[in-house]
């Protein structure tokens, strides 16, 4: 017979001769002891020869052409071929319908490679699947029919007065609810669900309660079941079970409520009305981590977007328990769900201090190095929301170090949160400022700003944090130098112009002012164009304020101040002039400022009703008047009159700067002019002394300065913890310096609202639109009282950037 007409059994590999097939099957079936006679364990021979070294010499394993030793005759081989053919139907039957074979019958296998199923085996797979589907369908139908017939009787038994009967019925229903068909039948019977709810509400029998609530738990995995439970009034009954001492009952109740809260409309309100929040907070004292994870997730669902729920959690002691969980466990899902609750509560002004007082900042900081990104993100969000209430908290050194490290993350949200937290925690806190500087925070923040590009959600808080670090603490000069050494000056100056928005520009102005305090930064800032950009911003903001002033004068109405992106243009005027004031200390910078034709604006600002603007204008004129050219331009612009008027200002800083400018302008004047000016300055000083309303009260200041300061200036200006109001001695309007509450995304926080007090002209604080979410730090020093004499043999020393009324740009604010 030719090779092409050779017969190949369908379940053997093709292209093998009949003799070779028989030999292979014979080896598989006969040459290996089955264990029936010898009792040895049945095993398939190794095809690689590695399992039995004695098989290495067997030529059959490697070369079928060599044949077998001459142990079998041709007749024996023919018999084996015949047996193989005769058992084919049995092999098919065994593969497709194994349950029809009699026990004890062995069918020889024809599988050569265990990794390659035979044709029969491949054909058997769909038939087995079909068989199982038919069996399942029959069972499903049987279950459904059984449940449908049994439900009416079971309802009667559940309503029986005998608790034993109720218990037995509840257990039967529980068993039925474990199968899909009967579970659907129970769900479709409102009477059955109502009977189960009555059973858990009225029964005192533990087994009845456990079986009934277990059934409701099984039903709650399906939307139809959730609706049935809700309509049957199951939520109050389930909430009642949250007081059960039995673990299984508690588990069934809380998981059923959890499913309802997740997927059933109206469940949240029903749980709140049933007192579920209080009971859930009590359950936080347990120690089963998986149980606690469900409870905390329920609390998060109930508290999200509902202020009343947040206050109930607070009144029940929730913050303390939640912080305890964050400190005590390492189960990731529990930590994640708990951090979600804390995140929701952290936007509540009442819960925020409670969480901080409970040690929430430290507890959340423990998990910033956790490998779970979702946990780290939630902790950072929560810390950001809490950070404005934690500016006075001690022991945050580990948190600050972690935040500096987190700034290197590639996750935008992580970096945004870390920068915002650092901005708030370094506000008005010298210890935190020093800590951040010592752990490389300045370098990290500069790199963050460079890498952020135009992502203002990162650059604004990072710039605010740098502004805090560059003023009012022992390492501030080091921080000012570090920004330059890390190539940050050019990047920061670029933030002063588009596409930056006004809140970022305002923050950058304050940072530039602080950086200019370092003499080594004066020239680089000039070379990078800082003066040009500041002057441009000043002119733009000044024009806007003048336009607004003209509009008010024309219409006679009280129009609100000029705003852009929530920033008052008066703040930009004040900040830019203040920064130019510091930059003008350097002679080359003064020359460049004179060339910008901006001195007329400085003179006009002397008439402004906002005292801080008057002060910074007088301050920059004081520096510019140090050069003869500058003094001449100032006089030509008509500054003598307003400066003379400002000598009588109750704001000591304004008066002193005005006196200094007038003195410098008088250097080339005749002796008679100098004498009249000396009398004017001396008279003004005496008037201040005569009008001293403090008497002999000791404020801890030099006697001359104490005599010249009013009460609001002494307390708010020198020792205030927040930005005070800027008031005018001429009865001008108060100027809002602090920041109102400004939520970020769905989260509230990041601000410190400051009391706005009246001084001098007094007045209630106006409502001002929020300008930035980041808290600001007061930068206030002391004026050298000994220099405040007006003997014209020596020019009066101007305030050394230590202003009675701190301006926003001159602060961490």
Swiss-Prot record:
Post-translational changes noted in the entry: Phosphorylated on Ser, Thr and Tyr residues. Level of phosphorylation varies both during embryonic development and from embryonic tissue to tissue. Sgg is required for phosphorylation and wg signal negatively regulates arm phosphorylation. Hypophosphorylated form of arm increases in steady-state levels.
Main location: cytoplasm
Summary of subunit composition and partner proteins: Interacts with Mer and Moe at the adherens junction.
Bias (Low complexity): 765-775
Localization of this protein: Cytoplasm; Cell membrane; Cell junction, Adherens junction
GO MF terms held by the record: cadherin binding
Any one cellular-component term (Gene Ontology): plasma membrane
Gene: arm
Family named by the database record: Belongs to the beta-catenin family.
Keyword S-adenosyl-L-methionine: no
Membrane topology: Peripheral membrane protein
Residue spans of the ARM repeats: 139-178, 180-221, 223-262, 265-304, 349-387, 388-427, 430-471, 477-517, 587-626, 628-667
Presence of keyword rRNA-binding: no
Disrupted gene: phenotype observed: Development of anterior structures in the posterior part of the segment.
Protein name: Armadillo segment polarity protein
Keywords linked to the UniProt accession: Cell adhesion, Cell junction, Cell membrane, Cytoplasm, Developmental protein, Membrane, Phosphoprotein, Repeat, Segmentation polarity protein, Wnt signaling pathway
Positions of the UniProt region annotated as Disordered: 714-779
One of the protein's GO biological processes: Wnt signaling pathway
